[in-house]
Regions:
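N-terminal helical cap/lid subdomain that shapes the substrate entry/recognition surface
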Residues: 3-13, 18-97, 101, 116
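Asp-based, Mg2+/Mn2+-dependent phosphohydrolase catalytic module
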Residues: 1-9, 97, 101, 114-115, ...
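Internal catalytic-core helix/loop-beta-alpha segment
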Residues: 100-108
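Residue-level marker of regulatory loop/turn positions in helix-turn-helix DNA-binding domains and
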Residues: 92, 110, 143
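Hydrophobic residues in well-ordered beta-strands that form the structural core
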Residues: 21, 109-111, 187
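Conserved residues at beta->alpha junctions
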Residues: 17, 109-112, 169
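Short glycine/serine/threonine/alanine-rich loop segments
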Residues: 44, 73, 105, 160, ...
Length: 223
């Protein structure tokens, strides 16, 4: 084990573009469904829908947060609709399935998506049995990362001491609140859209291109 991480008791992972590669393109499918949902909601064309979608994403952290605030959208209806995508692009990751159980302590998923979708993805990757808990958008009170409130709820819910916790995420802005709480942070810099938005070097302890490669280096030795 990397000596810089021997104090870590709780390992927290983002889901999309973190536990699977951004190159999978899965979020592009969700993006398309979000656009279609907004077209139906507002009766607008695809160009306007895309503009609205991205504005909400940039201003509120997620498209859903903006739609709830400005258009009183039901979160359950929205999430069920946009996550109704095929998951064939997501491949089973046997290596990740071997590495995660070797991490000392507990493992959690912290996602701006919802739990049903997250469980489907984790099943596809082959790692659904390796996590003690899942903290989704409903659990944050619909205040998505990087809103600090969701991180505080995560820690309170599972009894996590930030000083002994690590968060891996593909978006720097989501690491900033974690670092402020005292967590160790890992930026999975693998090409996510706006992954470097709000870049703050002092909020990043480790910068890695591939989560599996990094975990192999961290754990070292043989299984």
């Amino acid at each position: 084990m990397d000596p810089r991480l021997t104090h870590i008791r709780d390992w927290i992972f983002d889901l999309d573009n973190c536990l699977y590669p951004a190159s999978t393109g899965l979020f592009a499918l969700i993006d398309e469904r979000m656009g279609a949902y907004i077209q139906r909601l507002l009766g607008c064309d695809p160009v306007e829908a895309k503009t609205v979608q991205k504005r909400h994403f940039h201003e509120h952290g997620t498209t859903l947060a903006g739609l709830m605030k400005e258009h009183d959208v039901d979160p359950h209806d929205f999430l069920e609709d946009v996550h109704a995508i095929p998951l064939e692009r997501v491949q089973c990751d046997e290596r990740l399935g071997r590495l995660l159980p070797r991490l000392p302590g507990r493992r959690f998923v912290f996602t701006n998506g919802d739990a049903p979708y997250a469980r489907r993805v984790l099943e596809r990757i082959g790692v659904s049995d390796h996590f003690e808990g899942l903290h989704d958008i409903h659990a944050t009170g619909y205040r998505p990362k990087p809103d600090p409130h969701g991180y505080e709820l995560l820690c309170a819910r599972f009894g996590i001491d930030p000083a002994y916790a690590l968060l891996a995420d593909d978006m720097v802005q989501n690491l900033v609140p974690a670092k402020a709480l005292g967590m160790t942070t890992v930026w999975v810099d693998n090409g996510s859209e706006r992954g470097d938005h709000g870049f703050a070097e002092d909020a990043i302890d480790f910068r890695v291109g591939d989560l599996g490669d990094w975990l192999e280096q961290v754990l070292g030795g043989t299984e």
